């Protein structure tokens, strides 16, 4: 569900939620869930859409939206006519400016590495507990 939050953020904002040149700082931002809705790109996005992203990008998995909860969110279940009225052209232009392939690949690599590190940490702790 967290990954879905990242994808929705990119689709609605035109750029990823976690951007940093320094990989260590990028990992820190991801682990702490530090991202922003910059008014320049998010001014046209509804509060319901931002709320959905916030609930999906919650760091603690026990309080993060489940798939069922996300599907019942107001933004997901909104009338098609409301969505049709939204102009996403601004997002498309921002997305074109963004070097998506390179940055997204780096973000995915970061998530994969963070998951591997978390898994190694759990394995290490488990081995210590068993000793």
Regions found by a protein language model. Give the residues of each.
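A conserved short helix/loop substructure at the end of the activation segment
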Residues: 52-69, 78
């Amino acid at each position: 569900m967290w990954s879905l939050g990242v994808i929705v953020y990119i689709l609605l904002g035109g750029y990823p939620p976690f951007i940093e040149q320094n990989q260590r700082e990028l990992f820190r931002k991801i682990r702490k869930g530090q991202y922003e809705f910059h008014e320049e790109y998010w001014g046209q996005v509804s509060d319901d859409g931002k709320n959905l992203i916030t609930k999906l990008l919650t760091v603690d998995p026990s309080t993060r939206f489940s798939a069922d909860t996300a599907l019942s969110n107001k933004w997901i279940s909104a009338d098609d006519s409301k969505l049709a009225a939204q102009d996403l052209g601004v997002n498309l232009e921002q997305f074109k400016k963004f070097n998506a392939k390179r940055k997204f690949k780096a973000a995915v690599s970061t998530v994969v590495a963070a998951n591997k590190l978390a898994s190694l940490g759990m394995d290490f702790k488990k081995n210590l507990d068993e000793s």
